[in-house]
Amino acid sequence: MIRLSKRQIILLHDQLVEETGGMSGIRDDGLLESAIAAPFQSFGGEDVYPSIQQKAARLGYGIIKNHCFLDGNKRIGTHAMLIFLELNGIELTYTQVELYQIIISVASGESDDKKLLEWLLNHETWKAKYTKDFSWGFYCTNNIQ
């Protein structure tokens, strides 16, 4: 599994702010570290968030709700979540309006990380896969058990 580092998220934030406007800078370093670490917590040797989708939802939710940055928390939370999914082979299909609605819902407190996870799962893209025995099969990247 590919993880985004704190440095990568800060660089992504700086790039977003430069391109879309707003203030650059971290408001609370501890809250940023917490948001980045939360998806990878374990308890009793088991991941609290075992699937890639669960980790992505928790990452996006944590950055948005922790208000780690001076500005652009919704933008970077969304961007980090989507990049994390893409880096780990999960593709989504959605409109900008759908994405906007779920992110505003999370930011306002109307939706939690479970609702965000549900949204991610409902927007996963099904892919065609060519198997070893030269037959075509279809699979969804959803690996929640």
What are these regions (language model features)?
Residues 1-145:
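FIC/Doc superfamily catalytic core
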